[in-house]
């Protein structure tokens, strides 16, 4: 199962309509002059970001998109109607690239702001345009110009304030379920989360932030292991990272080693990712073994000046304090400090 964050589509602007060859035919005028009108301009291809969309699924199902062509010119100097624009609404955060050259054509970081990606072809001129003193009855007109066409690759990077980072099955999906309206699929096996999930977390005083439940990473993710390339790409625009650890498996699994392995993957994929601020979250505090193991891992993080928040995504223990810390990271202060 793949998640929809990249799609290749073909877009074409509208062709211009052909000009018209026509002559006046009126009572008592035996040899009327040329009156062929111009063809209409083809429709443009326009892209615009919208917060109402969160995936590229619709374009994956309909990869060929075309604007309307201009209508034919007509007699009596009537111009053809313009072709209808093709307006593509895309999720905020979509990067548009030329599929052949990999050139970035647009980076839709804000909603609105429509951008003309391909211009429609010009309409052809009618024969009325070609009449001269020496050539009063031109019997030709221009064809319309063809529209532009292009193969595009659309990449969607999540626009989230907070990203949940960690090995598979450490409780990221459980946490985002607890604090937001998101309902990701949850089960006790690796790679349950097969696509990034977004949840809106309602904080105090009507404030909110977006949390991204990024699928679990494994060693070799920067080389694509476990779909790692796609997963890591979603972290690039996340403002703050929560690094979730499960210490219930000690000593069979070493959470410190897992923490270091993931940070190594971040650095190998993009050094700037490894520099992002992280808050350490120890999950599953409702289990007695986790309370016993907490003292064994705390010194490692304290020595590195990292804040550690013990929580239980199952019971809600410690989550209010964690949300206050997120608020401090995002806005500079928790609600009660304002």
Swiss-Prot record:
GO terms for molecular function: GTP binding; GTPase activity; magnesium ion binding. It is found in: Cytoplasm. PROSITE patterns: G_OBG, GTP1_OBG, OBG. CDD domains: Obg (cd01898). It holds the Pfam family MMR_HSR1. Residues 1-159 form the Obg domain. InterPro entries: G_OBG (IPR031167), GTP-bd (IPR006073), GTP-bd_Obg/CgtA (IPR014100), GTP1-OBG_CS (IPR006074), GTP1_OBG_dom (IPR006169), GTP1_OBG_dom_sf (IPR036726), OBG_GTPase (IPR045086), P-loop_NTPase (IPR027417). One of its GO terms (biological process) is ribosome biogenesis. Its cofactor is Mg(2+). GTP binds at residues 166-173, 191-195, 213-216, 283-286, 312-314. PANTHER family: DEVELOPMENTALLY REGULATED GTP-BINDING PROTEIN-RELATED, MITOCHONDRIAL RIBOSOME-ASSOCIATED GTPASE 2. An essential GTPase which binds GTP, GDP and possibly (p)ppGpp with moderate affinity, with high nucleotide exchange rates and a fairly low GTP hydrolysis rate. Plays a role in control of the cell cycle, stress response, ribosome biogenesis and in those bacteria that undergo differentiation, in morphogenesis control. This is GTPase Obg. It comes from Geotalea daltonii (strain DSM 22248 / JCM 15807 / FRC-32). The lineage of its organism: Bacteria, Pseudomonadati, Thermodesulfobacteriota, Desulfuromonadia, Geobacterales.
